[in-house]
């Protein structure tokens, strides 16, 4: 009874002393607080620190008293070091050889454990440039020196069938084969990695690429043109992507694409479908001319890149190669009109339909009320002499190829607005304005003698009056 009472008194003493010390200042408060802190610190501890375990030396840090053994590469790489003198059978361990000698009735003995402390052995790497060739960095295990030599200086003969990794030690290959393919790190882009470090490196690059693409959204205009049959065929060259900027379409009042907007093309769209009308919807297996459609003065900002000097002189329409066939003579799909449609809008810029048989497409396009007036007005700033030189070259090329002279049976309704007469500079075909243009761009003769007959009676001094 008294013992339990003493225990309760001892357990409650610190609390009582602390509360008394906190009650207020007094002559004995400091001594009581110091005694309470001493009792708290003197609580018995039952845990005793265990003695440190003896650990073996780390690889490359041998015991200074160990015996240093240097083996040759041939000895290290030998699979069977211990040979039987009777049958020349080899064994990896001496104990196995001794057990084998029993079968030959030869004296044998196994190593017996002695009470004497055995001196440890360390092994040097035979490669002079290796760090373990130094006795201070020798390896303390015969199997360890063998694996080290195979891994660092030997041939990797073991190959994984799943990931094609090669190993020099068979145990390493077996350990890898058990885990190969079980751990997969899959990136959002679809790439699969078996190693985490490779996955982290790839993921950092992949995320950076996604962020860069999100900050700079661009339209791959070359890819869009290539999807329609090739960029060069439709007139997209090196400077096309820079010329097709937003300033050329919506913000530049002097842009050469003003007639397209007036003809019904919506050029103020979002970036995703801004170039929808300029991408061909159907491919043409026949290669077209390599020049772009139109080119005017440099201040009009058109999409023109020429590689022939003819474009610099004519300024409006680029002639193709003389070896091209009839329907690829001009890259004039801008003025194209289909035979099975009565729509009056301007067709696709780069579509080369099957019904545009050569120069007749130029006639139909230029005489249509929806395209000729707009195009002529827009190109009113071009030099009138360029237009004259253009028509002269057209006639010369046509005469060389033996094509129909009706190509030049043209009549511009807005020629008066350009400061000229009611016809072009020279009536080099003797037509005298005999063309009637319908609304849908289908032109025809309104009467009079055939064109061939008129050309026979044309002015004899005219350079293009002869058939």
UniProtKB/Swiss-Prot annotation:
Annotated source species: Arabidopsis thaliana (Mouse-ear cress)
GO function term, MF aspect, one: transcription cis-regulatory region binding
One GO BP annotation of this record: asymmetric cell division
Zinc finger annotations (CCHC-type) as residue ranges: 185-208
Residues given in the record as Zn(2+) 1 binding sites: 160, 163, 176, 180
Function: Probable transcription factor.
Zinc finger (C2H2-type): 82-104, 123-153, 158-181
Entry keywords, A to Z: Chloroplast, DNA-binding, Metal-binding, Phosphoprotein, Plastid, Repeat, Transcription, Transcription regulation, Transit peptide, Zinc, Zinc-finger
Phosphoserine modification, residue list: 72
Cross-referenced PROSITE patterns: ZINC_FINGER_C2H2_1 (PS00028), ZINC_FINGER_C2H2_2 (PS50157)
Region Disordered: start-end pairs: 38-65, 440-467
Polar residues composition bias: residue spans: 39-48
Chain sites annotated for binding Zn(2+) 2: 187, 189, 202, 206
Protein name: Protein indeterminate-domain 6, chloroplastic
